Design a protein with these regions (language model features):
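Residue-level recognition of pore/gate-forming positions within transmembrane alpha-helices
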Residues: 13-16, 37-38, 63, 106-110, ...
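Residue-level signal for inorganic ion chemistry
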Residues: 29, 78, 159
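Intramembrane alpha-helical segments
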Residues: 1-58, 115, 138-145, 150
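Extended hydrophobic alpha-helices typical of membrane-associated regions
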Residues: 115-173
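Solvent-exposed interhelical
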Residues: 64-112, 143-144, 150-156
């Protein structure tokens, strides 16, 4: 066991404890979820390199934006109930601007993933692939209806495809 990896894991405990209460105090519980949910990337970096190298830090940062995107979509399912019960979320904060924020989060995520693919392979095809995927996501998400629980659930579940794409993308590039 790498003691530094274990200690890095323990550093996430305060975030894990505070996350369930974030909706009471901030409109950004999705950010806290992103910090917590992707912490394993930092642990892996420590385990294999005994440091958090730039590649893994950028991967962690990218995954935070991915979490912001998909969990904001998920939050739109509960937006009306959250408004009635004074519960905060990015869906409540963004309101009708949800498409723009979610697409911004996805774009940042994909650009960082594209950069990591390029740095790993030196292949500009990685950026071309990412730009095509961003374009496809823009077209695809334009059909997302912010006021529909079913639509939000559908686009939330689509993140399985995004995860699969990113896995193979990083594997190939």
């Amino acid at each position: 066991f790498n003691i530094n990896a274990i200690l890095t894991g323990l550093l996430s405990v305060p975030l894990i404890i505070f996350y369930p209460y974030m909706k009471r105090y901030t409109h950004w519980p999705q950010l806290c979820l992103g910090l917590v949910f992707n912490w394993g990337v930092l642990i892996v970096s420590i385990e294999f390199f005994n440091e958090i190298n730039l590649y893994f830090f950028l991967l962690y940062f990218a995954c935070i934006f991915w979490t912001l995107a998909y969990d904001t979509i998920y939050a739109y399912q509960d937006r009306e109930d959250d408004l009635e019960n004074n519960i905060k979320s990015t869906a409540v904060l963004f309101g009708a601007l949800g498409h723009k924020f979610v697409m911004t989060f996805y774009t940042i995520f994909f650009l960082i993933i594209g950069f990591l693919g390029y740095k790993s392979s030196g292949n500009l095809l990685s950026f071309a692939t990412i730009f095509l995927f961003i374009f496809a996501m823009i077209l695809y998400l334009n059909k997302w209806r912010l006021d529909s629980k079913n639509s939000s659930n559908y686009y939330f579940k689509f993140n399985n495809i995004i995860g699969l794409f990113c896995f193979f993308f990083l594997l190939i590039f």
